[in-house]
Each structure stands twice: as C-alpha cells, then as structure tokens.
Amino acid sequence: EICACLVGSEMCIRDRAVTASQMNRLLNPPTTCNELPKEVCQAQDSLKLMLLLQGMPYADLAHLHKKDIQGDLLTCRRRKTGTELCVKVVPEAMRLINLYRNQDSSSPYLLNFLSGTLKGEAAFNEYGRKLRNLNFQLTRLSELCGVGDIKVSSYTARHTWATLAKYCHVPEEMISEGLGHSSLEVTRTYLKSFDGDELAKVNQVIINYIYSGKKKLWSRA
C-alpha cells in the first residue's frame, strides 16, 4: 500500500497524489465551478472527508459504523489490515458527517453511502457500484475544476495526505500510523505508538497546507 511507496520507490505515490494547490482547487473550485452537479458535489464531499480523516480509504469510510464515533473521536478498524485507526474529527469533517449521517435506524452504517441491508455478494456489488460512480464523478470534478490533466480517484486523498505529510517532514512512522498501516513492523518494535494528540497535529498541518497554501514543517514542540 502507500507505506511501500514511502519506504521504497516514490513513483506510485506521485501517480496518485496531487499537490496542495491542486487539492485546494478540487475542494474549493473557482467561482465558475461553484454550481457543481449534485453527484459531483457529493463526490467532492467524499474526497474532502477522506482527506480530513487522515487519508481514510473509501472502503473504510463507507463502512464506518455508528458506534465508531464518540464525540469528536472516530475509532475503527481498517477493513484491509484490521489495524485500529483513531482520528480526531475536525469541525469541517463533522459537518460533512452530519450532512451524510445515516438516518435509517436499521442500518449499522454511520453514513448513508451504503444501504446496510444487503449481505454477501449483493453487498459487495453495491459497494463496487458506489466506488465506480465515485471515481467517475471525481474525474468530472477534476475536469470542471480545470485540473483534468491529473487523474483523481478514491485513492487521491489517501496518497495526497501521505505525500504532503512527507513534504512537511512528518516522520514516516507517524505517517504510517496516521494511515492505519500494519507495516513498518520492525520499526514499531522499538518505537512507541504516537498518541492521538500528535496525530491530530499532523492532520492539522496537512489541512492548513491545503487550505492556506502555507507549508509548515512538522514539529513536536
């Protein structure tokens, strides 16, 4: 996954990541792009939410459970690795969570992206359709925002979060933990886990970089 790119070749990160200014343009279109089609706007919200939640993958975002959020703390296990992920929910992310909060009491899911009523292959197919549509709408978003020369997909937020963190000199071990990776096991045998407050600061550094355009190097001070 991304961790392999951080430790080894950076080429695959660059292929999926965008610059801070490009992400800003995607999340805050120029005046001519303000009236986005509804489905494109929803895809933009998903992109923003994935970014604000420490580069959370769409698979994890769509399958978040209502019980996973307590106050402004989101705690879940990654579907791919089973690694526990704890994210402090910033106000804008909470606004989007509330906007898409699932009102169906019979569904276990926090967000209304999936029905929560399907099982097995039917549930798998539903998720596949949602993911394909998200990627299609993100391509439309990039074209409408004048960045159609870059490939934007459900991976973009995650890879961009990791890349910008690295540009801001955040230690790779913190990036790995922020993303909920199970890799870098050798490093983790002698490194303490980073607490939630430190990861929240990392996330805020990246958010500020994208929204203000000001790059601030990571510091624990």
Show the residue positions of the predicted features:
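Short, basic (Lys/Arg/His-rich) helix/loop patches that form interaction surfaces
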Residues: N28, T32-K38, N135-E177
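Conserved tyrosine-mediated DNA breakage-rejoining catalytic core shared by Y-recombinases
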Residues: H63-L99
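Catalytic-site neighborhood detector that most strongly recognizes the C-terminal catalytic loop/helix
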Residues: R78-G82, L179-Q204
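Single conserved hydrophobic/aromatic residue that forms the stacking wall/gate
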Residues: E1-G8, I13
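Active-site/catalytic core of tyrosine-dependent DNA strand-transfer enzymes
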Residues: A17-T19, M23-N24, V90-D149
